[in-house]
Amino acid sequence: MKRELKVLIGLACLFVIGLPVFAQPNSRSIETFVLDDFDSAGSQNYMYNGKTYNWDWEVGSSRFIADGYPKTGYFEGVPNSLKQLHKGEDKEFKVFGVKSAFKRKGDNWFEVYPTSDGKSFEIPFVGVVSQMDFWIWGAGYNYYLEVMVRDALGTVKVLPAGSLAFHGWKNIVINIPGWIKQSSHLRSGPENLTFVGFRIRTDAEEYVDNFVVYFDQIKYTSNSLSLIYDGYELNEVDFGDSSDSDEVSGGDAK
């Protein structure tokens, strides 16, 4: 009798302990978003907060860039791994390319960044981002790639993405560190982490003429529901004072 009682008590304990595990709701929604596949220039149709965004790509460089550089363009091409994913589709694949040359060796760099209406445009990420990945074509030069993002405090963070001293296509995956602040409680501050652009630096001893790089399919993985809460839509209600917001002193208000 005692043995049966012990068995019943043990089963009851297991049920009580396991109950919260099964009853606990899961607020995580892990999704993958494509920022740009470069197949339709200026027609990304990227969705964020119910709005559609499109952009172009520009390149800025350091002072010793050679005359007539950098050069950019969209070209036919696709990594073999991506081609297999679209096997059988009647689709024209494009990549975005940059060709650079500098007048001398040293700490040279150029940045590839999105623009809209002729101005730099930072692409907002949906939710809390855990990682980014993209395809890049290396020419074997000892150059270094960096990814630039802006956190919810308005500070640009530079994430190293490794060397470009390889030939052909390579899938680069970078994790977004947990110490980067991706949301802010300030209603007047940035809503989310944003993508600023890529920066490519030359090694001080590497050749700086005739360098070429290509980009394809930039995407990211995110917990898309992490910043959504009950009543989220009320956050953007207009009280009729939006036109007067510039009259409030930022120093006095914050």
Question: Model segments located where?
Answer:
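Beta-rich carbohydrate-recognition modules and glycan-binding surfaces
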Residues: 23-254
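Bacterial N-terminal signal peptides
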Residues: 9-18
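Bacterial N-terminal signal peptides that target proteins for export
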Residues: 1-9
